[in-house]
């Protein structure tokens, strides 16, 4: 099992476009032995301390294998809507790991 944590930074005014992309991307996770464990849109007061920009959303996803994650990234339906992600996401940071 691999775990992916993603910090997502949105371009100002593109929140609705990002939500539209997520409407297609998130349901496809299960097709590739994945599970969305957590999707957080933290408010301003949720941050106790930070030395990086505050993300718009934080996702934690689990996949059975690294190959499942790679296959998900190449999903034809997801790729069809990738332009929405490119239009709305300023940057994202991915952390990969395993359960200890």
Indicate residue ranges for each PLM-predicted region.
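Short S/T/G/P-rich N-terminal loop/turn motif that feeds into the first structured element of a domain
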Residues: 1-74, 96-100
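Conserved short beta-strand edge segments in small beta-sheet-based binding/regulatory domains
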Residues: 35-37, 82-97
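A common structural junction motif
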Residues: 26, 77-83
